[in-house]
Design a protein with these regions (language model features):
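N-terminal leader/targeting and accessory segments in enzymes
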Residues: 1-109, 113
């Protein structure tokens, strides 16, 4: 099973980390039923300078909203954070309790997909 917005949200929820999903300016408890949310991420990064088409960005540490400037135009697919950045980017957000733990889980899923 590839890492998509839906599988990432399910994984984070199963581990008690997911608080909310922000999608199309709506807050919800799960990813809506939209085929576009089943497109696999091309990469996971926590460095905004490396975001490219299809990237999942994990916002951790001393992350600042201004780091997100221009990322929609570079292909940001979604972000994981403990803060809502929907005022800065259009990409869906997975709001979690601990972005570092979330990074560990989704990175493992990308490198070792579930069967």
């Amino acid at each position: 099973m590839p890492l998509t917005l839906r599988t990432a949200a399910r994984l984070l929820s199963d581990h008690g980390l997911l608080r909310e999903v922000i999608h199309d300016d709506r807050w919800m408890m799960q990813v809506p039923d939209d085929p576009a949310d089943d497109v696999p991420f091309s990469a996971i990064t926590y460095d905004t300078r490396t975001v490219g088409g299809g990237s999942l960005l994990v916002c951790k540490g001393r992350f600042r909203p201004e780091y997100l400037d221009g990322l929609d135009g570079r292909g940001l697919a979604a972000y994981v954070a403990d803060t809502d950045y929907s005022a800065v980017v259009d990409a869906p957000g997975l709001i979690v309790d601990d972005p570092r733990k979330a990074l560990s889980l989704v990175a493992r899923l990308l490198s070792e997909p579930l069967e």
